[in-house]
Amino acid sequence: MAHQFPALTSEQKKALSETARRIVANGKGILAADESVGTMGNRLQRIKVENTEENRRQFRELLFTVDSSVSQSIGGVILFHETLYQKDGQGKLFRDILKEKGIVVGIKLDQGVAPLAGTNKETTVQGLDGLSERCAQYKKDGADFGKWRAVLKIDNQCPSHLAIQENANTLARYASIYQQNGLVPIVEPEVIPDGSHDMEHCQYVTEKVLAAVYKALNDHHVYLEGTLLKPNMVTAGHACTKKYTPEQVAMATVTALHRTVPAAVPGICFLSGGMSEEDATLNLNAINLCPLPKPWKLSFSYGRALQASALAAWGGKAENKKATQEAFMKRALANSQAAKGQYVHMGSSDSASTQSLFTASYTY
């Protein structure tokens, strides 16, 4: 029986589907430049640069004003509220610079996490209050997609059934509100890499989480063709002593997705989860070469793993513009190649690209 109360019109569905497919077309992925003021401050502190709005603006200007050919690698950029309204040195809005390159503009809309009482320090996501109005304003101001991040951890009795169900339902509710306002939802249920668990444990938990998320999305009448998934790769915990190859990570990851993610979803854009730039690229490449059916585009939505080398090259100095932009373009191209299974590892002498970017209990 046809749904008695359709959530979206055929025109709304068409627009959402086209935007989602455009973001992940032909090896394109997402630059996650939605770090909060505090998180960006931590990054700047490591290169001994003061955390001021101007310094944050200057670094992001370098990323957004690279050669237009970046649009062959980057299909979308997720911005933080501050960044959506910032301008380059000539007074042009960043969002307009990106749109002129053919890059879709997105926005982070969750408001962080809050404790779930009665659990082992588990959390749920904040930000549903007033979300529809904020979505409408961001859509008016040029955003066409948005991100909502839920955090689940592997620990003693974690993630609990309550945490999985609560976060799945919150992700689904947000996705529905986004779509009602013409924004493609980037659904991000992150099983964080904190801990000493092995890869098999992570796969088990990831499958349980994704199954719950897609059940909730169905319950909330979310149009899957107009969404993208931003999951963790299936990896061992950061403190696990056993090491796994990219091929092992790929097989576990694609198996988990194959068991839980409907083929209607146009694209899966992995988060980097604190991996080094090079490891994030190698794992993505192996995932695309994995000999299992892959009905979705398998791409990237990286923050640290696209920016670490560029940030190190910049060092807060205007004269390092060329080196900064070259470092960013190099990583963007490498990940675009990996999204097509065409990346060739040549060995890296760049310490920034091979350095672990892991931060315990990482928050945006």
From Swiss-Prot:
List the active site: 188 (proton acceptor), 230 (schiff-base intermediate with dihydroxyacetone-p)
**Entry's CDD domains?**
FBP_aldolase_I_a
Q: Which SUPFAM superfamilies match?
A: Aldolase
Marked site positions, Necessary for preference for fructose 1,6-bisphosphate over fructose 1-phosphate:
364
Binding-site residues, beta-D-fructose 1,6-bisphosphate: 43, 272-274, 304
For this record, an example GO cellular component is: cytosol
GO biological process annotation, one example: glycolytic process
Modified-residue entries (N6-succinyllysine), positions: 13, 121, 317
InterPro entries referenced in this protein's UniProt entry, alphabetically: Aldolase_I_AS (IPR029768), Aldolase_TIM (IPR013785), FBA_I (IPR000741)
Q: What pathway, per the record?
A: Carbohydrate degradation; glycolysis; D-glyceraldehyde 3-phosphate and glycerone phosphate from D-glucose: step 4/4; Carbohydrate biosynthesis; gluconeogenesis; Carbohydrate metabolism; fructose metabolism
- State its location(s): Cytoplasm, Cytosol; Cytoplasm, Cytoskeleton, Microtubule organizing center, Centrosome, Centriolar satellite
Fill in the misc note: In vertebrates, 3 forms of this ubiquitous glycolytic enzyme are found, aldolase A in muscle, aldolase B in liver and aldolase C in brain.
Question: What function does this protein fulfil?
Answer: Catalyzes the aldol cleavage of fructose 1,6-biphosphate to form two triosephosphates dihydroxyacetone phosphate and D-glyceraldehyde 3-phosphate in glycolysis as well as the reverse stereospecific aldol addition reaction in gluconeogenesis. In fructolysis, metabolizes fructose 1-phosphate derived from the phosphorylation of dietary fructose by fructokinase into dihydroxyacetone phosphate and D-glyceraldehyde.
Name of this chain's protein: Fructose-bisphosphate aldolase B
Q: What is the lineage of its organism?
A: Eukaryota, Metazoa, Chordata, Craniata, Vertebrata
